[in-house]
């Protein structure tokens, strides 16, 4: 069948149902984007490519469907680097389209030329460059399939002079593989260990959400009366109201989850790669059960046993593996110490929820006084925990939320609770600042009838705030964005108070900036609040207005209390050896 290369490209997108593209328009992609309206593909023209990539991540995580990121070759697609690595560690299947400098001039250092394959090699699960115009549909189909199989972004690189050529090809067929279901022997061994366990604990990771395995994990938990922890930043991997839900592990997570998993004799780590940051000690508890039998289930075999000693490794889909383990459990599975375990889970969960609801302030380490001083300097300002409680009071149960990286968002890690998956978007293990805002826009595009609320500190928000100039245009959906204003890079400032004797370098933000006024200037709505009651009222109104098509930025002024440092494991106090003296600075010779 004869068609142009761009027609072939778009027809393959249609075959796969890819209806949304995020990026900035550029000449190298215009032959394709020209066909988007006819094809039923919406192009979301963003203010920056990094934000575009994070919108695509938020869209796909919220919907479970694939979207596309596309930009101009060279300085356009370089903006996708952070976003693609973020999506990679968020296990988000995305299509990244990188038009390349013309094939006949590659290697001559021409306009907007860079080696785009080398650039993204570590950012995607698969990449392929088109070598001949006739192979565009074949390669695109394969790249899309590889993204699904790898559960991560995949890249197609296309020299721009391959467009507007006539080719005679048949469109490729879609070949989908069944997800692996795990090995029978490993599943039988896992079922035996769980059947004999006296204190089984289930740890649900992102794979439970991605694989739609929440119900299956719940059935296992109820059969065993096993408490269920969620992985770091995966609070939506188990219903928070369930009697066996004990909250997230990891940084600023649930003390109940940490205390209970520390008692486990068998841990079923379901759909998780057990990344090391997610199991670091918290609240002074080194909770990972070093003598427990660990059953790790992950669809990627390379990640099983990578960070923890594993007794049984199962390469398989979380849903199918959980179903099979449940079927093979012994009739008396979970009976050993069942009543004592149920009572302890209830007591520990209740005590933590009560403690969490009464925690108002952050502690100082011995020998430091920053948090005490912050409260004394601004006694009328809210603390981060008071802010999070006010937020939880009005956040709709069905809402999708996003959080950014940083101090104030991190303090809130234990607070959000969900009844279903695909409700919690967090930056993940790449940890980029600036994620909260664009990702929630992407989620709203994918789920227009669901209320969405994004959260970011003032430093992180400043990285992606240029999207305020794009989302007020016709056709863009309304969102609600909460910005925590403490006028500092809080996480780095906490490090400085602990290890660098309050020698603050680069930690202070502009106190004269008003994001609410910037929102007004962009034709959006900006509100500033400084009390819990005002925050609750403003957030409730913003969510109500969102349904009417009004975007609101709620700027929350709070005190400068600082939470637990992110990397206590990686920091230490510096020691002067040679010493540094300003007098040693020399004047440079001009070029």
UniProtKB/Swiss-Prot annotation:
It is found in: Cytoplasm. One of its GO terms (cellular component) is acetolactate synthase complex. It is an enzyme of class 2 (transferase). Residues 359-383 are annotated as: Disordered. GO terms for molecular function: acetolactate synthase activity; flavin adenine dinucleotide binding; magnesium ion binding; sulfoacetaldehyde acetyltransferase activity; thiamine pyrophosphate binding. CDD domains: TPP_PYR_POX_like, TPP_Xsc_like. Transmembrane segments: none annotated. Keywords: Acyltransferase, Cytoplasm, Magnesium, Metal-binding, Plasmid, Thiamine pyrophosphate, Transferase. Pathway: Organosulfur degradation; taurine degradation via aerobic pathway; acetyl phosphate and sulfite from taurine: step 2/2. Pfam families: TPP_enzyme_C (PF02775), TPP_enzyme_M (PF00205), TPP_enzyme_N (PF02776). It catalyses: acetyl phosphate + sulfite + H(+) = sulfoacetaldehyde + phosphate. PANTHER family: ACETOLACTATE SYNTHASE CATALYTIC SUBUNIT, MITOCHONDRIAL (PTHR18968:SF13), THIAMINE PYROPHOSPHATE ENZYMES (PTHR18968). This is Probable sulfoacetaldehyde acetyltransferase. It comes from Rhizobium meliloti (strain 1021) (Ensifer meliloti). The gene is xsc.
């Amino acid at each position: 069948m004869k068609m142009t290369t761009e027609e072939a490209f778009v027809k393959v997108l249609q075959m796969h149902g890819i209806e949304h593209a995020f990026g900035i328009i550029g000449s190298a992609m215009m032959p394709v984007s020209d066909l988007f309206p006819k094809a039923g593909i919406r192009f979301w023209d963003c203010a920056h490519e990094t934000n575009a990539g994070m919108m695509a991540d938020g869209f796909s995580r919220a919907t479970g469907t694939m979207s596309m990121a596309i930009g101009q070759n060279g300085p356009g697609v370089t903006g996708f680097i952070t976003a693609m690595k973020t999506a990679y560690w968020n296990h988000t299947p995305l299509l990244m389209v990188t038009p390349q400098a013309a094939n006949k001039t590659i290697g001559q250092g021409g306009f907007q030329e860079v080696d785009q394959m080398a650039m993204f090699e570590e950012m995607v699960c698969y990449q392929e460059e088109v070598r001949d115009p006739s192979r565009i549909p074949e390669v695109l189909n394969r790249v899309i399939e590889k993204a699904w199989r790898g559960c991560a972004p995949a890249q197609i690189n296309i020299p721009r002079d391959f467009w507007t050529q006539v080719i005679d090809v048949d469109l490729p067929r879609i070949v989908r593989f069944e997800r692996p279901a795990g090995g029978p022997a490993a599943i039988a061994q896992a079922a035996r260990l769980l059947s004999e366990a006296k204190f089984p604990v289930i740890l649900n990771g992102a794979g439970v959400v991605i694989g739609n395995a929440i119900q299956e994990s719940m059935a296992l938990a109820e059969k065993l009366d096993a408490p269920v922890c969620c992985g770091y930043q995966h609070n939506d991997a188990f219903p928070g109201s369930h009697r066996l839900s004990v909250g997230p592990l990891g940084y600023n997570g649930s003390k109940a989850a940490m205390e209970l998993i520390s008692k486990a004799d068998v841990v079923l780590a379901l759909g998780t790669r057990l990344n090391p940051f997610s199991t670091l000690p918290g609240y002074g508890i080194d909770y990972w059960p070093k003598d427990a039998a660990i059953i790790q289930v992950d669809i990627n075999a390379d990640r099983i046993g990578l960070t923890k000693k594993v007794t049984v490794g199962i390469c398989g889909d979380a849903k199918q593996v959980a179903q099979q383990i449940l079927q093979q459990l012994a009739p008396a599975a979970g009976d050993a110490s069942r009543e004592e375990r149920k009572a302890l889970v209830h007591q520990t969960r209740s005590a933590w929820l009560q403690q969490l609801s009464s925690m108002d302030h952050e502690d100082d380490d011995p020998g430091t006084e920053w948090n005490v001083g912050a409260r004394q300097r601004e006694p009328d300002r809210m603390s981060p925990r008071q802010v999070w409680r006010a937020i939880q009071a009005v956040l709709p149960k069905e809402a999708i939320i996003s959080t950014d990286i940083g101090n104030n968002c991190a303090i809130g890690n234990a607070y959000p609770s969900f009844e279903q998956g695909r409700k919690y978007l967090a930056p993940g293990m790449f940890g980029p600042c600036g994620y909260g805002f664009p990702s929630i826009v992407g989620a709203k595009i994918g789920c227009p009838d669901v209320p969405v609320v994004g959260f970011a500190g003032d430093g992180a928000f400043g990285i992606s705030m240029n999207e305020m100039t794009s989302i007020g245009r016709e056709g863009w959906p309304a969102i609600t964005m909460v910005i925590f204003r403490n006028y500092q890079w809080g996480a780095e400032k906490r490090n400085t108070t602990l290890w660098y004797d309050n020698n603050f370098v680069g930690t202070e933000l502009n106190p004269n900036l008003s994001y609410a006024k910037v929102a007004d200037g962009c034709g959006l709505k900006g509100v500033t609040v400084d009390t819990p009651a005002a925050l609750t009222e403003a957030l409730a109104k913003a969510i109500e207005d969102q349904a009417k098509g009004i975007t609101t930025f709620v700027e929350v002024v709070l005190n400068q209390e600082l939470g637990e440092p992110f990397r206590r494991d990686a920091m230490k106090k510096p020691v002067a050896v040679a010493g540094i003296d300003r007098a040693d600075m020399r004047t440079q010779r001009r070029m």
